[in-house]
């Protein structure tokens, strides 16, 4: 059976679960958190080109090069959101972005300065 290298792995989910339980002020609410996230994702309609073009806040788009959000899709968003910036983290999936502090933190500092 073929699997996509762009989708989160079982290890990604295990790491996410462990981090939530370790860092959350309410680690016992994890199942409720997952339920709410699932409901939110099920209702996700996305944004139209017109809605993206109306964004006025400074915007930094961050994806991994192995993210399920493709570089092409992120580049389209970059073109649509005025003045936005795009960072593509190497050898990184969607769920691994926050684990790349070595790359992410300097970018965020520059963006927020």
Question: Where are the predicted features?
Answer:
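Flexible "cap/lid" loop of the alpha/beta hydrolase fold
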Residues: 1-18
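Short, glycine/charged-enriched secondary-structure capping and boundary segments
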Residues: 1-3, 74-78, 101-104
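Alpha-helical elements of Rossmann-like donor-binding domains used by nucleotide-donor carbohydrate transfer enzymes
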Residues: 15, 19, 32, 36-39, ...
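Hydrophobic, aromatic-rich cap/lid helix
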Residues: 23-49, 66
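Short, conserved loop/helix-junction motifs that constitute active-site signature segments
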Residues: 52-56, 79-81
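Short beta-strand/loop motif that positions the catalytic acidic residue
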Residues: 54-55, 61-63
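Conserved alpha/beta-hydrolase "acid-adjacent" motif
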Residues: 68-73
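Catalytic active-site module of serine/aspartate enzymes centered on a nucleophile-bearing elbow/loop
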Residues: 84-113
């Amino acid at each position: 059976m073929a699997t996509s290298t762009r989708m989160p792995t079982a290890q990604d989910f295990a790491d996410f679960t462990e981090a939530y339980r370790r860092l959350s002020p309410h680690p016992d609410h994890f199942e409720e958190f997952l339920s709410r996230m699932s409901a939110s994702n099920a209702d996700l309609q996305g944004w139209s080109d017109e809605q993206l073009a109306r964004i006025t806040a400074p915007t930094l788009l961050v994806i991994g090069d192995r993210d399920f959000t493709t570089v092409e899709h992120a580049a389209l968003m970059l073109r649509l959101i005025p003045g936005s910036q795009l960072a593509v983290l190497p050898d990184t999936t969607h769920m691994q972005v926050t684990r790349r502090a070595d790359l992410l933190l300097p970018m965020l500092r520059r963006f927020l300065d």
